[in-house]
């Protein structure tokens, strides 16, 4: 069985995240959206809200599930029997950052990282940009799935 972990904070889930997940469904038997929890980090949306956004967005996709975790992603992969880490790439800076992590993960384990390029229509979207638009009272509805719009 081809099982992938898609890790992130998803604060909040964006159309970019959603696009990567949708496009990965035919590639894997199971996709686990893994929300990383870091006690040192301040989040705009609660963990429960972030889980709800993802569950609602993918409610009709039985191969997609959501969990939260702490610690190393490769440890989570080993625990859940996942052989792949799924990552989206928006730009060259993402690639350089993700490449270093992928090489480290590969050195520490046998887990492969699979990169998908974001669609041109969503390549400019990041959770940071969405949070900034929200903080400044802007219309963020064109940047996020429907489930996030009705917070």
From Swiss-Prot:
It comes from the Bacteria. Substrate binds at residues 9, 41, 73, 87. Its main location: cytoplasm. Its EC number is 2.7.7.3. Pathway: Cofactor biosynthesis; coenzyme A biosynthesis; CoA from (R)-pantothenate: step 4/5. It is found in: Cytoplasm. ATP binds at residues 9-10, 17, 88-90, 98, 122-128. It is an enzyme of class 2 (transferase). GO terms for biological process: coenzyme A biosynthetic process. Keywords: ATP-binding, Coenzyme A biosynthesis, Cytoplasm, Magnesium, Nucleotide-binding, Nucleotidyltransferase, Transferase. Its cofactor is Mg(2+). Coiled coil: none annotated. InterPro entries: Cyt_trans-like, PPAT, Rossmann-like_a/b/a_fold. The record marks 17 as: Transition state stabilizer. It catalyses: (R)-4'-phosphopantetheine + ATP + H(+) = 3'-dephospho-CoA + diphosphate. Homohexamer. Belongs to the bacterial CoaD family. Reversibly transfers an adenylyl group from ATP to 4'-phosphopantetheine, yielding dephospho-CoA (dPCoA) and pyrophosphate. This is Phosphopantetheine adenylyltransferase. It comes from Flavobacterium psychrophilum (strain ATCC 49511 / DSM 21280 / CIP 103535 / JIP02/86). The lineage of its organism: Bacteria, Pseudomonadati, Bacteroidota, Flavobacteriia, Flavobacteriales.
């Amino acid at each position: 069985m081809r099982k992938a972990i898609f890790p992130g904070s998803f604060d909040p889930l964006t159309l970019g995240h959603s696009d990567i997940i949708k496009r990965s469904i035919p590639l894997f038997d199971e996709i686990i959206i893994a929300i990383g929890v870091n006690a040192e980090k301040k989040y705009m949306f609660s963990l429960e809200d972030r889980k709800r956004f993802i569950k609602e967005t993918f409610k009709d996709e039985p191969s997609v599930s959501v969990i939260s975790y702490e610690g190393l992603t490769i440890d989570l992969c080993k625990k859940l029997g996942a052989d792949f880490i799924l990552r989206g790439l928006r730009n060259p800076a993402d690639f350089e950052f993700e490449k270093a992590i992928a090489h480290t993960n590969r050195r520490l384990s046998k887990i492969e990282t699979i990169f998908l390029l974001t669609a041109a229509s969503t390549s400019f979207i990041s959770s940071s940009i969405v949070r900034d638009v929200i903080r400044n009272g802007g219309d963020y509805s064109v940047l996020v799935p429907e489930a996030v719009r009705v917070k």
